Amino acid sequence: MGNLRVDVITLFPEMFSAITEYGITSRAVKQGLLQVTCWNPRDYTTDRHHTVDDRPFGGGPGMVMKIKPLEDALVSARQATGAAAKVIYLSPQGRKLTQQAVKGLAEQESLILIAGRYEGIDERFIEAHVDEEWSIGDYVLSGGELPAMVLIDAVTRLLPGALGHVDSAEEDSFTDGLLDCPHYTRPEVYADQRVPDVLLSGNHAHIRRWRMKQSLGRTFERRADLLESRSLSGEEKKLLEEYLRERDDS
């Protein structure tokens, strides 16, 4: 896992300034850990209207992105990034993007992301060029740009040196198959609500134990499905039981 180059085929390259100019991803770009390059299919059209879409065969609402502009943009991206880059289409039909999948993508040196628009892209392009399809959830968006940015952000967090603290990525939700624990900062008391005493104790072993207990309990309450695919250790089972007892007694 090292530096990452991401090439994005998109009709709206200006949207990706959110990645290159703000936050952790911007810092990764400045540090040379991440490179994001956009390719606009409109730049590969030959008609005066720069047409990138057409009506679907068989009728129906909406328009479909044409093969040729997409293919020519992909050729340019491949020439810039190399033939080994994995081509990913962001699509509601894809597999759901998980933290485990993000870890796998972070192992790549380069990725080419296809951000579709309209009703989608010509299926023949997908069959000929796309290696993987990924979805960020069971809902429909106006285009693939936001999912592409979600993927880039998630992958960037796993690049060595991208985060300010070496443990930050490991403590994120889902990294260990669990939701994150609650977090608190100053003041110690706000509107009569106190920070849990254990976090003020300075006892790091007790703090780690409390955080794990909270992560287990929160996952059980909010995303029990995550626990079904994770084998709990004896200590983790004990902590979860303790959490549930404390909850029921409160």
Swiss-Prot record:
Similarity comment text for this entry: Belongs to the RNA methyltransferase TrmD family.
Annotated protein name in UniProt: tRNA (guanine-N(1)-)-methyltransferase
Coiled-coil annotated spans: none
Source organism: Pseudomonas putida (strain ATCC 47054 / DSM 6125 / CFBP 8728 / NCIMB 11950 / KT2440)
One annotated GO molecular function: tRNA (guanine(37)-N1)-methyltransferase activity
Binding positions for S-adenosyl-L-methionine per the UniProt entry: G116, I136, G137, D138, Y139, V140, L141
Residues passing through the membrane, by range: none
EC number, as in UniProt: 2.1.1.228
Gene name linked to the record: trmD
Assembly behavior: Homodimer.
Listed PANTHER family: TRNA (GUANINE-N(1)-)-METHYLTRANSFERASE
Ligase listed as a keyword: no
